[in-house]
Amino acid sequence: MAIQHPYHLVDQSPWPLDGAFSGLMMTSGNVLWFHTQKTNLTLVGFLLLITNMVNWWRDIIRKANFQGSHTAIVNKGMRYGMILFITSEVCFFFAFFWAFFHSSLAPSVEIGVAWPPSGITPLNPFLVPLLNTGVLLSSGVTLSWSHHSILAGNRTESIQALFLTVALGSYFTALQAWEYIDAPFTIADSVYGSTFFVATGFHGLQVIIGTTFLMVCLFRTAGRHFSTHHHFGFEAAAWYWHFVDVVWFVLYWLIYWWGA
């Protein structure tokens, strides 16, 4: 039967049910992990969830590239969806910054009426944090280079620039892990440690997600999935990565520099 509309009506798929089952397994596994220190169910649920995500997104890519299901109307809807997703991430960080300022602008007697609290040695903002700022800024430049190369039809330069972006994102994660290991305080050290590690850790998670997103785009670029006019998957990854860049600048300014 001919389709008389520009919308994509998805076919029946096992992936939503499989994803729900994997999420249930991970949640149940986390409960067991917290109470019995056994991680088997959590790991199995996590592996099933990763498998589900890979297969589901592979189907989406196939329908976009090889079946032509993603029309201009569908692309417009996905753009709105990505904007709403990034907006939800903004709300997350707004909550983290609210908690940070609530604790730092009027320190309570429990932490010595001082910020940072008594006994806390904050990290030097001009060492690893400043290096990480330079790394993320550079990754934003290389990502823009890759995007402009796609628009110009230069696939080779786009691959090179995207590879550099993925490498810089991985380097940022390694530096962040080293900073956490070497930090003179932990997440259990008063509200300072809690707000610091939750805010920077959540951002670090976004960097890992963004790096994975860009890595997929790298493979897709090498596989000639993107054209000069049809590359929303790349654009969505670029939007997300630039959002991560902006959040880091705010984190560096408020938590590392002002907060110290």
UniProtKB/Swiss-Prot annotation:
The keyword Membrane applies. Gene3D superfamilies: 1.10.287.70, Cytochrome c oxidase, subunit III, four-helix bundle. It is found in: Mitochondrion inner membrane. One of its GO terms (biological process) is mitochondrial electron transport, cytochrome c to oxygen. The chain crosses the membrane at residues 41-61, 81-101, 133-153, 161-181, 196-216, 238-258. Keywords: Membrane, Mitochondrion, Mitochondrion inner membrane, Translocase, Transmembrane, Transmembrane helix. The keyword Transmembrane helix applies. Its EC number is 7.1.1.9. PROSITE patterns: COX3 (PS50253). It is an enzyme of class 7 (translocase). It comes from the Eukaryota. It is a multi-pass membrane protein. GO terms for cellular component: mitochondrial inner membrane; mitochondrion. InterPro entries: Cyt_c/ubiquinol_Oxase_su3, Cyt_c_oxase_su3_dom, Cyt_c_oxidase-like_su3, Cyt_c_oxidase_su3-like_sf, Cyt_c_oxidase_su3_a-hlx. It catalyses: 4 Fe(II)-[cytochrome c] + O2 + 8 H(+)(in) = 4 Fe(III)-[cytochrome c] + 2 H2O + 4 H(+)(out). SUPFAM superfamilies: Cytochrome c oxidase subunit III-like (SSF81452). GO terms for molecular function: cytochrome-c oxidase activity. Component of the cytochrome c oxidase, the last enzyme in the mitochondrial electron transport chain which drives oxidative phosphorylation. The respiratory chain contains 3 multisubunit complexes succinate dehydrogenase (complex II, CII), ubiquinol-cytochrome c oxidoreductase (cytochrome b-c1 complex, complex III, CIII) and cytochrome c oxidase (complex IV, CIV), that cooperate to transfer electrons derived from NADH and succinate to molecular oxygen, creating an electrochemical gradient over the inner membrane that drives transmembrane transport and the ATP synthase. Belongs to the cytochrome c oxidase subunit 3 family. Component of the cytochrome c oxidase (complex IV, CIV), a multisubunit enzyme composed of a catalytic core of 3 subunits and several supernumerary subunits. The complex exists as a monomer or a dimer and forms supercomplexes (SCs) in the inner mitochondrial membrane with ubiquinol-cytochrome c oxidoreductase (cytochrome b-c1 complex, complex III, CIII). This is Cytochrome c oxidase subunit 3. It comes from Strongylocentrotus purpuratus. The gene is COIII.
